[in-house]
Amino acid sequence: IVCDKSVKIAGDVFTNDIIYYMRTQHNLFVGETTAEKVKIQIGAATEDLDSPPEDMAVDGRDLLTGKPKRVDVSYREIAKALDKSIQRIEDAVMETLSQTPPELSADIYNTGIYLAGGGSMLRGLDKRISMKTDLPVYIAEDPLRAVVRGTGMTLKNINKYKGILIK
């Protein structure tokens, strides 16, 4: 690991962003399970998607009346709800790139950036980071297991990587 920047943003943060958005913009109280479904079905990192998902009916409790309520929500709304958290990810990427040694910067310029983890599967995140960095951005093959597999390979070959893992 040549340089790194850690940001405490994961799928749970996106889920909480959706819960907050539904409460403040629609006066609708939704639970984690519902917010997670919204994130998976229509979650987006940008309003500019090539093939956007259909609007989604979201059920919850009306905060004003206490009655059950249904609201139609678009992916554009969810992109707005997630915007601040995604900006934090973009800032971390830009900070990391600014600290990257020149030789590695050349490699990144030629090969691009690879995203891993569940958050990388958010629609348009690769496109948004690419627009911010002016670099190609790809989603890793099997993004949910990529980090674990990479860590496992490194641990199996610890002597090979020891020199670059210790700061």
Question: Predicted regions span which residues?
Answer:
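Residue-level signature of catalytic and energy-coupling elements of molecular machines
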Residues: I18, V93, L115, T151
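Glycine-rich phosphate-binding loops at beta-strand->alpha-helix junctions
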Residues: A106-I129
